[in-house]
Amino acid sequence: MAIWQGKSMKKPSGGRAKMNRGKRKYELGREPAETKIGDRRVRLIRTRGGNTKVRLASDTRINVVDPETGKVEIAEIRNVVENTANPHFVRRNIITRGAVVETNLGNVRVTSRPGQDGVINGVLIRE
């Protein structure tokens, strides 16, 4: 079943609200990408205007910026350490923006949106 992002059918009192029009195509949503650790897999999604969006299903590498030197390196992701979006994402190794992942260079905070951009970028965290 599709995800509908339109107005709720409940009134503030909890009663049922009547629709004054039907649902529209632009109110449709999609399932979240839920990017995991694994071999690189991407899904191309057609968006409005015929544009494309790259959904990253899984990847093992991350582009890491060292804030002190400004140098970018590619690191291997080992596991997810922290995720403020959902505490259960840590257990399931799901990567979202703001997640902290453990790499061979150290802990890295993800700055890109893997489900929207199709790439994982991050900033090295100095302890």
UniProtKB/Swiss-Prot annotation:
In its UniProt record, which GO terms are filed under biological process? Answer: translation
- Oligomer and partners: Part of the 30S ribosomal subunit.
| The entry's keywords | Ribonucleoprotein, Ribosomal protein
Supply the Pfam families for this chain.
Answer: Ribosomal_S8e
Query: What is stated as this protein's family in its record?
Result: Belongs to the eukaryotic ribosomal protein eS8 family.
What cellular component GO annotations does this protein have? ribonucleoprotein complex; ribosome
Provide a Gene Ontology MF annotation, just one: structural constituent of ribosome
Report the protein name in the record: Small ribosomal subunit protein eS8
Keyword Ribonucleoprotein, does the record have it?
Answer: yes
